[in-house]
Amino acid sequence: MTTREQRIEKYHADRSVYQAVPKSESLSRTAKDRKLCTSLEEAIKRSGLKDGMTVSFHHAFRGGDFVVNMVMNKIAEMGFKNLTLASSSLIDSHFPIVEHIKNGVVTKIYSSGLRGELAEQISRGLLNEPVNIHSHGGRVHLVKSGELKIDVAFLGVPCCDTFGNANGFTGKSKCGSLGYARVDAEYADKVVLLTEEFVEYPHHPISIAQDQVDLIVQVEAVGDPKKIGGGATRMTTNPRELLIARKCAEVIFASGYFKDGFSLQTGSGGAALAVTRFLEEKMRRENITADFALGGITASMVALHEAGLIKKLLDVQSFDSVAAESLARNPNHIEVSANQYANYSSKGASVERLDMVILSALEIDTKFNVNVLTGSDGVIRGASGGHCDTAASAQVAIIVAPLVRGRIPTVVENVITCVTPGENVDILVTDHGVAVNPKRPDLIEALSKTDIPLFTIEQLCERAYSITGKPKEIEFTNKPVAVVRYRDGSVIDTVYQVKD
């Protein structure tokens, strides 16, 4: 009878041959605490980070995020250079990145948006290479296509177990959905969790799973959840924004798409988020129930869900603490990843099931192109977000915006920067009137049967200019500071350095 060794030697198909390993050695390699790091510095060292690599972050804590600055400051202190920073978005509190750019720590950026001092400095030429501005769905497309290769993802979570199972809706600092982080956890070469506390294994429900996580480090705080629902995601009390929201609700009622089983999303911005307030009464009166609401979920949507008026909530990002807590207790409040939410090249994105999306704008022009990125001075002060993803996919895309802001017109002849192309925008609702894209005669016909006064967008532009005067053209240099990527990865516009 032959031995096992003889049988293997006779035929092993050119595969490696088993080598015995003492069990003590196997157990050492698979120690239960092997992922735990005693400090952030240890986690960075063990991640294998090297100069020239790409580090990524999520922005579920929005204005309350602590992780980006904490990690980037430590990375800079450790002497790393020439890194690509790929955060799902960057906001005002990330101003320390300015120094990291000046010192050569960060030389390239991918982000959905920029705000505050960081945006101001980049708009004035701080970064040698233009920032890649992508949509939320577009980011996933760039990651999956291989253009945006994430070497190390640093993901903040309120709590997890010591093996890496985590979600964003348990623990002290609840941020809600980890929809953006889930993409990084799946595609990054190395995943480092930063957590405030540990819970018993196995932690459940699971948003980020143990088989995706390499290293874990406990820190004092990953974010301030009280600052999630501020800025662009605040709930407005502004009378003008509420007027626009009420007008938008009337347009929705008359559109032909407001019927039992409809679906909707509201984008960021006071008026857009406020629309849900004005839907409830009509839904109750006409016994209409929405099948689902999508996107950034708010307290207003949770209230409609718990009242039985919206059957399901699909949550890629929780816009306030009420939404974060709802995710934990309501079984039909469902977390979705950014891939499931809006990726152009996924096998099925939830945006493709939308009937209506209500979105804000910094500018909209007479061709219905929308700018949500640069201000009237040409400085970056916003984010692409899911704007172009949802506008392209929803049956009806509605823009809500004031006709003018102070002495600045919102409706203009040409937007400074195009993020969402006009062919995907259907209706504009302002405090001075409503305009429907001529390419949607069905909507023009439906709204013409109501007492809603309709204008051409050219008429609204003229009215805006009669109030503010025609804006002066901004002077730019020839240096590009950002390229705006459409959801399929193509370049839809380029932002140039503002001339001082």
From Swiss-Prot:
GO terms for biological process: acetyl-CoA metabolic process. Its EC number is 4.1.3.6, 2.8.3.10. It catalyses: citrate = oxaloacetate + acetate; citrate + acetyl-CoA = (3S)-citryl-CoA + acetate. It is found in: Cytoplasm. GO terms for cellular component: ATP-independent citrate lyase complex; cytoplasm. The keyword Lyase applies. Pfam families: CitF. The keyword Transferase applies. InterPro entries: Citrate_lyase_asu, NagB/RpiA_transferase-like. SUPFAM superfamilies: NagB/RpiA/CoA transferase-like. Keywords: Cytoplasm, Lyase, Transferase. GO terms for molecular function: citrate (pro-3S)-lyase activity; citrate CoA-transferase activity. Oligomer with a subunit composition of (alpha,beta,gamma)6. PANTHER family: CITRATE LYASE ALPHA CHAIN (PTHR40596:SF1). Represents a citrate:acetyl-ACP transferase. This is Citrate lyase alpha chain.
